[in-house]
């Protein structure tokens, strides 16, 4: 019989309301079932969700719904990473308070997320800008301070003189602020730091336990922590070139084996010797200032032209005092790594080689590959930085690099310069303590008070929270807290004298470093309920972009350890499983070229295929526009698709199904209208097949078949159930989709037969069993459609509360097996035969194979060994 088309605009809000009324997704901490905590990285409330959000949250929702059906007590919360600069920028540009802008955006985005039908526990929702959240963050800060995990020191920072704020190294581009474009200044400011370096070795070692994390992320963190074993080497300054009072330069190196290849030393622009030289030389002063203005991120250092300036200082080689080397100030040496000084071995380091070629410094090969020829080995345009055998290194020649390392380390450790060893073995880490001070209003206030008499005084916990004042103005750059007439003035908690509040706020990465813990008991009057936190942590499955591989994920690992040290949690790691999904990308379209190029939105064009080539035209004018590359969706290039438009046109289930179906979840998915329409056709087809057969199916109870014409129906359904269950366990969503398509195709004819009134009761019962399995398989991805189909079959209760089906082992076994056939130990053929075939049947079938007949060439086999359902061996 004909049925109405599935109408998502009617069905989706209706089922969302029922889930909400029934509180299906609210989690009870006292539920005794095994727990499963699934969490997607919570969003910044920018105002609108984008298709990347849809994909991220759809993946998490599949996991949550699937695990809930499998009988777990699932925690699947949502909140808002709500502090940060965009809100202050909006305040300056639009004259709206950051809080108003933020909470309006949260309301809009929450409505969008609810329209997606996500199985979220909204009762645990919070925003990090809620006073009730950040007061607990202030409590944690004070606990860390008491434990010695927080300290304050003078630190050089990148200062944007237009925005009047500190910039991270990554925010300095070609010496200018990323937002204002102003030339960045280097300033000494007193900053607050978290002692993440206390856990350097533990953070590194524990990476080996994170076997459910992508190897790429673990490697990125390993490199960021940057443990190295090396040597500090003290180089004597040639007295007649030494600045007053200076006698040596200390260098940290991981390659002391290459010392005989040294041709220069390089120091950072902020090294004490560089500062001394700059004070006496205008040219050096200007060069040091140029170095400071350049970006100090790794990317900036690697791509910038290598520059240096000879200081005139000379040092004596530690292994040969008669050998003098020049000391340069170089733009690629940083004061906050090692000692702020390096020795350059051009033959063994590409950066040093480029530098040496530029300034005419010697290049002496000192390491060659183990199969190299010392007489002919040379260095051209590429340095050799591998392991190998020492050459041109005097007493080290012929040694391996490892042997040479130890020989040099032992020799310099035994040698003296002044009254101390000239060399000392050392373990170094690239990881630096986390500076959390930000000169901004819209962040968590740091709960300390500055008193002229008492110094730095922590705010007593009984006086928390330190609330942000609401009566602030953004009519000028800088931190409004600095110029607030009353908020910063406060009595000292110790002596009662006039004092000042700290006006810096915390880095917003602090907010996201423990939110997953707060979700376990967001109503608790303390930062955590240890019992709840210890029950739920670590998060079983965390989902988010790989762009957070370093900072957020590393800071969260530190925070969990710091909270362990202060008694708030027992867990050591925050996230047991990590999945980094790919982006949603789209073609770009543009008109014009160069500076006059104008990007065009996908909604404003139509695509035609003319003479076998895809071409794009403006809807408004039929003007042809250029089809560009496929790139990450971005507002700047207008290649964005609004989820609201897709949901309004096709429904949330179609959007969810498409972003899960078109490519492996760890890869980018290319957005295409054809793909979305294909997903929509699937939802309509599934509804039509189920709804047309619903009256007949609802009259019988589901029961799989064990024989007869319905057996193939039951086998197809139960085999698919087993396979998709494995796919969901491994987050292979696209594979699950492919199998579901196959099952729909397999069930189309049986469902059509039942709809036409054909088939006996056993056949209809088997088809109903298969149809219910199909509905339950699609439910995690298309939950509204699944509920509609489930109800159409006459099932009472919500599918969202229904247990996952179990496959019948007898139905998933293959009837045939493929046996390899070996003759005298060599595989010669394969035999496909019934799983139940006895030994005689297998033997006769093997001897009848052409490949076996040819191999035997008329000979009778001495022995045939049949290992049931495994292998056949023939001995000739």
Curated annotation (Swiss-Prot):
Pfam families, A to Z: Anticodon_1, tRNA-synt_1, tRNA-synt_1_2, tRNA-synt_1g
Binding, ATP: 635
EC numbers: 6.1.1.4
Span of the annotated motif 'KMSKS' region: 632-636
Molecular function, one GO term: aminoacyl-tRNA deacylase activity
Catalysed reactions, semicolon-separated: tRNA(Leu) + L-leucine + ATP = L-leucyl-tRNA(Leu) + AMP + diphosphate
InterPro entries: aa-tRNA-synth_I_CS, aa-tRNA-synth_Ia, Leu-tRNA-ligase, Leu_tRNA-synth_edit, M/V/L/I-tRNA-synth_anticd-bd, Methionyl/Leucyl_tRNA_Synth, Rossmann-like_a/b/a_fold, tRNAsynth_Ia_anticodon-bd
Subcellular localization(s) per the UniProt record: Cytoplasm
Family matches, as SUPFAM superfamilies: Anticodon-binding domain of a subclass of class I aminoacyl-tRNA synthetases, Nucleotidylyl transferase, ValRS/IleRS/LeuRS editing domain
HAMAP family: Leu_tRNA_synth_B
Family classification: Belongs to the class-I aminoacyl-tRNA synthetase family.
Protein name per UniProt: Leucine--tRNA ligase
Organism: Rhizobium etli (strain ATCC 51251 / DSM 11541 / JCM 21823 / NBRC 15573 / CFN 42)
